[in-house]
């Protein structure tokens, strides 16, 4: 995979080391967020997979997609590409549940121009368990 962004970060494989989220030059000590350890991450991904594939007629697929996206980004299972994979999972889930008929959903631009709010909203869920504000933000991203 010569010339591919992130090629030194084991593309396609779950991470085997601790990662963190923060600005350029951040370390584990001053990270904005530290995802689960590699050991816990595997358990979290298994739980997420079960949730994604559970037959759940009571949760609207758009809301479930938002919850799945939050959880995937919180788990952060790869050293690189989590955002891209997370956005792809949204599209695949909505196609599977017939919310989309074609893979024509582009929320990357919305999330890019609202990056600070995107991170802040996910942090609110982690700090306070406030999923409602996250789901509203996610639905706004889908709508726009």
Where are these regions (language model features)?
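FIC/Doc superfamily catalytic core
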Residues: 1-144
């Amino acid at each position: 995979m010569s010339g591919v962004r992130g090629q030194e970060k084991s593309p396609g494989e779950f991470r085997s080391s601790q990662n963190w989220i923060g600005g350029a030059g951040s370390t584990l000590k001053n990270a904005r967020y530290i995802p689960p350890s590699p050991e816990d991450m595997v358990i979290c991904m298994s739980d997420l997979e079960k949730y994604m594939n559970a037959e759940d007629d009571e949760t609207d697929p758009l809301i479930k997609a938002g919850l799945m996206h939050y959880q995937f980004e919180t788990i952060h299972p790869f050293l690189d590409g989590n955002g891209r994979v997370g956005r792809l999972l949204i599209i695949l889930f909505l196609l599977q549940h017939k919310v989309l008929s074609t893979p024509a959903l582009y929320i990357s631009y919305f999330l890019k121009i609202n990056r600070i709010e995107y991170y802040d909203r996910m942090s609110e869920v982690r700090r306070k368990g406030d999923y409602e504000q996250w789901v509203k933000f996610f639905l706004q991203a889908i709508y726009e």
